[in-house]
Amino acid sequence: MSSNATDLTTGFIASIVAIVLFGSNFVPLKKYETGDGMFLQWVLCAAIWLVALVVNLILHCPKFWPFAMVGGCIWATGNIAVVPIIKTIGLGLGILIWGSFNALTGWASSRFGWFGMDAEEVAKPVLNYIGAGLSVVSAFIFLFIKSEIPNNTYSVDTTPLISEHVINKTQDPDPDCSWVDKLSTAQSHLVGCSLAVISGILYGSTFVPIIYIKDHSKRNDSIYAGASQNDLDYIFAHFSGIFLTSTVYFLAYCVAMKNNPKLHPEAVLPGFLSGVLWAIATCCWFIANRSLSAVVSFPIITAGPGFIATMWGVFMFKEIQGRKNYLLMMLAFCIILTGALCTAFSKI
């Protein structure tokens, strides 16, 4: 098997693993109260950093480039909005919105060479454009899929994984509820969608520093001359930026809460597991970037997690029912598959 064929195979396998894990990493948290998410995001980021430490040791501690930490800072900034997004518009819709803007930002910055990066060329640019477009179109189809979970069911075991946020107007206010729980339905939708858009743009920019270093490593006059072309060599710096930034945000939150942060101990282990799953998925994404290039991997990996989250809702939590919903899911899956194939063949 040729080197190019091996790279393609490795890249597509890594992409599949990343899609499955990104679509599943919040599932362990489904049954647990997470409050405003500030404590949870710190636990999740701590798990992410530990995975990076293991990977760094396996790779024999490659050179640490501080600039790669900036990408982690960008990601952590977007990540602090995840819990409010899920609470206001649901996990499925949240993933689909931030995934769409993630895909567009990451694909466009790589394809057109934004932020000082080299523009990436593909063998068949038209197919690449079509694939990127279909990846975004598929996301909007999921907006029409409705959950069948009754609104009067409050058990944590039946809370929809993909649901519309419903506020019980007659329920007594909980003194421990977060600011998100106090929003009206209209405010929740506006805030959730806005945060998802912002998070998506930030997520789509997270690889920019690493790609910038790799591109400038080929220039003798650059301070990054000779830097590694292996994306995994930047994992530790990238994830260190994530953990450092999340820690700063959490400490600032503790100060703002007058040293009385809302902690949810029952969410620690699920949050840690969620962080491990996310970290493994991101390592796979780094491998896909290396094997396929970001202009190919971004549309593929950002389109699939929404579909995986929907599958959890259908087969695990039984929250999506009805012929219309099933037909919409099949249509979305076909579009996702077509977009992924177009993007894949644009590389060949």
UniProtKB/Swiss-Prot annotation:
Gene source species: Bos taurus
UniProt keyword annotations, A-Z: Membrane, Transmembrane, Transmembrane helix
Primary location group: membrane
Entry GO terms, CC: membrane
Location in or out of the cell: Membrane
Molecular functions (GO terms): carbohydrate transmembrane transporter activity
Membrane topology, record value: Multi-pass membrane protein
Record field: transmembrane: 8-28, 39-59, 64-86, 93-115, 125-145, 193-213, 235-255, 267-287, 295-315, 326-346
Protein's recorded name: Transmembrane protein 144
UniProt similarity note: Belongs to the TMEM144 family.
Gene name of this polypeptide: TMEM144
